[in-house]
Amino acid sequence: MARILGVDIPNDKRVVISLTYIFGIGKSTSQKILKLANIDENIRVNDLADEQIAEIRRVALNFVKANGEKLQLEGDLRRTVAMDIKRLMEIGSYRGIRHRRGLPVRGQRTKTNARTRKGPRKTVANKKIETR
C-alpha cells in the first residue's frame, strides 16, 4: 500500500478512487490533484512509480481551493469539524442542542426513523392494570 499524507491507500484500485480514502479529498478534488500532477487517473496505485507518488504527495500538500484557501486534510479537518460542533453546542443554537441530545440536526423526522442518530430502541413496557 502506498502511503500519502499519513494514510495507506489501497493498491488494487484506480488512483482517482484511492485518493478519496484520505479524509477531506473527494472524487472531484482527487481528479484536480491528478490533473495538476500530470498523472492519468485510470492507472492503478500499484502501477505508479515512486516519483509519481511523491508528486501526488507534493501537489496534495500544496493544493489551493478555488477560493484561495489551502485544502485541509485528515487531522486538521477532523479537528476543525469537531471544534465547529463544540462551538454550536456552547452557544446553545438549535443545531448545537440537537447535537448535544444526539438527534438529527438537519430537520429529519424523529417520530419514526432516525435510528442511526438515536441508537437502538429503548422499549417502554405498558403499565399493568391492577385487578381486585
Swiss-Prot record:
PROSITE patterns on file: RIBOSOMAL_S13_1 (PS00646), RIBOSOMAL_S13_2 (PS50159)
Pfam families: Ribosomal_S13
GO terms under cellular component: cytosol; small ribosomal subunit
Oligomeric and partner information: Part of the 30S ribosomal subunit. Forms a loose heterodimer with protein S19. Forms two bridges to the 50S subunit in the 70S ribosome.
Homology family: Belongs to the universal ribosomal protein uS13 family.
PANTHER family: 30S RIBOSOMAL PROTEIN S13/40S RIBOSOMAL PROTEIN S18 (PTHR10871), SMALL RIBOSOMAL SUBUNIT PROTEIN US13M (PTHR10871:SF1)
InterPro entries hit by this protein: Rbsml_uS13_C, Ribosomal_uS13, Ribosomal_uS13-like_H2TH, Ribosomal_uS13_bac-type, Ribosomal_uS13_CS
GO BP terms, alphabetized: translation
Gene3D superfamilies assigned: 1.10.8.50, 30s ribosomal protein s13, domain 2
Keyword tRNA-binding (UniProt): yes
Superkingdom, natural source: Bacteria
Organism: Ureaplasma urealyticum serovar 10 (strain ATCC 33699 / Western)
An example molecular function term from Gene Ontology annotations: structural constituent of ribosome
Compositional bias segments (type: Basic residues): 101-125
Location of the region described as Disordered in the Swiss-Prot/TrEMBL record: 101-132
Protein's name according to its UniProt entry: Small ribosomal subunit protein uS13
Entry annotated with the keyword Ribonucleoprotein: yes
Annotated signal peptide: none
